[in-house]
Amino acid sequence: MEIGLREWLILIGIIVIAGILFDGWRRMRGGKGKLKFRLDRSYSNLPDEEGGSAEVLGPSRVLDTHKEPELDESDLPSLSASARDREREPKPVKASKRGKRASAAADVHQGDLNLSAEPREPDLFSDSDDDFAADNNRSSGAAPASNSVKELPPAEEVLVISVISRDEGGFKGPALLQNILESGLRFGEMDIFHRHESMAGHGEVLFSMANAVKPGVFDLDDIDHFSTRAVSFFLGLPGPRHPKQAFDVMVAAARKLAHELNGELKDDQRSVLTAQTIEHYRQRIVEFERRALTQKR
C-alpha cells in the first residue's frame, strides 16, 4: 500500500503537535520550582528601610494599635464636668419655682374651688365659674412662664370639668400622679398640671388641671402623702388653636381619671356631667369661635 503526499502531511502534523504539547508539559513541570524560588528570592531582597516583609506579614497591625490612643485624656474630665453641669441646669429653675410658690399659691387660692374638709358636696365648689376666669387672668399676668408655656390673652370663657372622689380618703397622690401622667399632663407653671400639644410636654397648652382643695396646687415633694377630694380640668377661651380637639382630649382625660380612680364627673354648675352637658360645652366653643371671627371682620 502506497502512502501519498496527503497522508505524509497529516502524519507530520500529528508528530509536530505532539512534540509541541510534550514540550509545553515539560516546561510547566520544570518551571514550578523556578517560579517559587524566584518569588522567595524577590521577597528576601526587599529593602529594609521601606518596612520590608513587615508590611506584608502584619506586624504593622501591632504598630497601628499603638498609634490609636491619640485622645488627650485630660479632656475627659472637662467633658464629664460639662455633662454634669448640663444635668444640674434645671435644678435652679425648680428652686426658683419653689421660691414663687407662695405668691403663686396665693393667686390660685383666690380662684380655687373652695373645697372644704367636710364631705358635703355643695361645699366642694365655688358659686360660679367666674373664679376660674379670674384665676386664668391672674395667671396670664403672673411671672413669665417657662419655654413650654406660652403666655395667653385673658380668658373670656372657661370650660370646667371636675372629678370628685367617691372614696372618703380622696384621690391618693401616687395613683393620681400616675393616671394624669398617662393622659399626657405634665407638672408646670403655677404648680399645677398642664396638657401640651405633645405628650412629652412641648408645644402650646391645651388645658390644665388644678387641685380643687385650697390652695389649689400640688406638692410633688410630698406626693406620697398627698390626697385630695377633687380635681378640676379647665380650658380657657381664647386658648389653644384648635379648642374643639383640645376639649375632646380634656374630656377623655377626665373620664379616664373618674373610671380608674372611682370618681364622679361634674360640670361647672355642680351637676353630674352628662352627654348633653358635653355637647353644650362644644356649642359654647362653636359660638365663641363665631364671635371671634365676626370681631376680626
UniProtKB/Swiss-Prot annotation:
UniProt cross-references to Pfam families, sorted A to Z: ZipA_C (PF04354)
Gene3D superfamilies membership: ZipA, C-terminal FtsZ-binding domain
Membrane topology: Single-pass type I membrane protein
SMART domains: ZipA_C
Gene Ontology cellular-component terms listed: cell division site; plasma membrane
Any single biological process term in GO: FtsZ-dependent cytokinesis
Positions in the Cytoplasmic compartment: 23-297
Family the UniProt entry places it in: Belongs to the ZipA family.
Subunit-structure text: Interacts with FtsZ via their C-terminal domains.
General function of this protein: Essential cell division protein that stabilizes the FtsZ protofilaments by cross-linking them and that serves as a cytoplasmic membrane anchor for the Z ring. Also required for the recruitment to the septal ring of downstream cell division proteins.
Protein name: Cell division protein ZipA
Taxonomic source organism: Pseudomonas putida (strain ATCC 47054 / DSM 6125 / CFBP 8728 / NCIMB 11950 / KT2440)
